[in-house]
Design a protein with these regions (language model features):
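An acidic-aromatic pocket/loop used at catalytic or ligand-binding sites
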Residues: 104
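Hydrophobic transmembrane alpha-helices
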Residues: 5, 176-184, 250, 254, ...
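Terminal transmembrane helical anchor/hairpin motif
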Residues: 34-45, 61-71, 194-275
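Secretory targeting signals
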Residues: 20-51, 55-101, 121-191
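Hydrophobic alpha-helical transmembrane segments
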Residues: 4, 17-21, 162-167, 192-196, ...
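Short helix-to-coil transition segments within interhelical loops
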Residues: 110-118
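Aromatic- and glycine-rich beta-strand/loop motifs that create alpha-glucan
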Residues: 1-24, 261-275
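Membrane-helix interface/capping residues of multi-pass secondary transporters
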Residues: 15, 117, 189-190
């Protein structure tokens, strides 16, 4: 069995991962993006009597939501904004927990000469990222079906949720995972989640539209497609920077594990050296 698969299964069985996924689904539900709480309609349009709330857009904004976003894109953008904000905090917890448990039960895996530090850390990083992306993929698939039922399959972009999950949310997961992983690898202490929680606390006062944000871009509106199109370049640069920074932090974590393997890294813990 490959190291990636072993790490992936270990992550999926961990209590911290199960708790993070549960919290993610609950946040998505209470943030009204899983499932969506409103259907997009044009100003002056007849309201369907099916009990679903409506989001009335001005004629120009509705035309963009219909022709550019094809409805599902507008919902997917709000989904990515709110779920991405939650994952910026939650993804750090399983990463920190895994290295925290290594202090007791998996020290042999860290010190084993048969597996390089770089392979171990990057396989673990990939497994953590894939595991946190899994519930997002399931929700994206479910919401694509919901959009097709609400607007008709011919009227929606069937790939919209997948594109936003891949290009908007995945870099957030990658960066937050690295933030959880690096302090735990350096010190053996779960400091990464504290940093993520601090960011989450400060993000409460962030502007509703922040496309260049490194951790989690924001687009807190169902619609506003023109604003999004004007800032898509800033969004792309921020997403690339987040992914590259996540990889850089992961490389630093691998260096820290290698340092410990050679008997020098324990000086990082309160000045003590390995015996």
């Amino acid at each position: 069995m490959s190291l990636f698969r072993l790490e992936f299964l270990r992550v999926c069985r961990s209590a911290s991962y199960i708790a993070a996924v549960t919290a993610l689904v609950l946040i998505a539900y209470f943030q009204n993006v899983f499932p969506p709480s409103a259907r997009i309609v044009a100003a002056g349009a007849e309201i369907a009597a099916d009990g679903l709330e409506t989001c009335v857009l001005a004629a120009g904004d509705y035309a963009l939501a219909r022709d550019v976003d094809r409805f599902s894109g507008a919902h997917a953008r709000l989904f990515a904004s709110r779920v991405g904000g939650a994952l910026a905090v939650l993804s750090a917890f399983p990463a920190a927990a895994l290295f925290w448990h290594d202090r007791r039960g998996c020290r042999a895996a860290v010190c084993a000469r048969s597996v390089s530090s770089w392979k171990l850390v990057f396989c673990r990083y990939a497994a953590l990222t894939a595991a946190m992306a899994l519930p997002v993929a399931v929700m994206a698939l479910t919401l694509t079906c919901v959009a097709a039922m609400d607007y008709g399959p011919a009227n929606v972009d069937m790939l919209a949720y997948g594109k936003y999950a891949l290009f908007w949310i995945l870099p957030t997961i990658a960066l937050s995972t690295a933030v959880g992983l690096l302090p735990a690898a350096l010190t053996g202490l779960p400091l990464g989640p504290l940093l993520a929680l601090l960011w989450g606390w400060r993000a409460r006062s962030a502007p509703a539209f922040a496309y260049a944000a490194l951790f989690a871009p924001r687009h807190e509106a169902l619609g506003e497609t023109a604003r999004f199109l004007e800032n898509v370049g800033a969004l792309a640069r921020g997403r690339v920077a987040a992914a590259l920074l996540g990889l850089a932090l992961c490389a630093l974590a691998a260096f820290a594990v290698e340092w410990k393997r050679r008997g020098r890294g324990y000086a990082l813990r309160f000045g003590r050296r390995a015996a």
